[in-house]
Amino acid sequence: MDKSESTSAGRNRRRRPRRGSRSASSSADANFRVLSQQLSRLNKTLAAGRPTINHPTFVGSERCRPGYTFTSITLRPPKIDRGSYYGKRLLLPDSVTEYDKKLVSRVQIRVNPLPKFDSTVWVTVRKVLASSDLSVAAISAMFADGASPVLVYQYAASGVQTNNKLLCDLSAMRADIGDMRKYAILVYSKDDALETDELVLHVDIEHQRIPTSRVLPV
């Protein structure tokens, strides 16, 4: 072998990549992608367990349907005797009811226990007759007929039980904002007397967009 051939062979040897270096790099990239995906899933899981700024006792949020927004009202049930009932019609603010033909897609109830709460309540939303006075007998019958989903909320040592919300889909009924006065939130205090300072109900009505927010609290 002459000198030029030896030099060429030397250059070729120097250019040859180190064995396994490329595959090791690809493997590291793949491992990094897997780790990133795992961290992303972990962050989402942890976020579901953290309070939010706007709703400190509730976690996460659900985005409204395209073209929809929501209006929230707050209900504070008065004292309810053991085994008795409370009902309140959904009365929206005038600034919302002026758009009475805007369709309503969902109604969501979020139960917020106050520090003294240590009992069990049943909560639901029902369409009621305009003539109904929401008497104890009338509300009792509506809970008993099984015609609507019921959220059973009970005391949780952590302060808020995991399933603290009830979401009712009204889109198939073509209900509108003007129809909301025909619906009522019903509460049954099953085991104990419920005091006025023990429970707050946040009711979110998702409807076609008017100038408000765009995220539905959960």
Swiss-Prot record:
Keywords linked to the UniProt accession: Acetylation, Capsid protein, Ribonucleoprotein, RNA-binding, T=3 icosahedral capsid protein, Viral nucleoprotein, Virion
Any one Pfam family match given in the protein's UniProt record, by short name: Cucumo_coat
Compositionally biased spans, kind Low complexity: 1-10
Annotated S-S bridges: none
Modified residues (N-acetylmethionine): 1
Location of region: Disordered: 1-30
GO CC annotation terms, alphabetical: ribonucleoprotein complex; T=3 icosahedral viral capsid; viral nucleocapsid
Molecular functions per Gene Ontology: RNA binding; structural molecule activity
Keyword match Ribonucleoprotein: yes
Biased composition (Basic residues): 11-21
Gene3D superfamilies named among the record's database cross-references: Cucumovirus coat protein, subunit A (2.60.120.530)
Coiled-coil regions listed: none
Places the protein is found: Virion
Function noted in UniProt: Capsid protein. Probably binds RNA and plays a role in packaging.
Record note on domains: The N-terminal arginine-rich stretch does not seem to be the major RNA-binding region that allows formation of an infectious ribonucleoprotein complex.
Family label: Belongs to the cucumovirus capsid protein family.
Identification of the protein by name: Capsid protein
Organism in which the protein naturally occurs: Cucumber mosaic virus (strain M) (CMV)
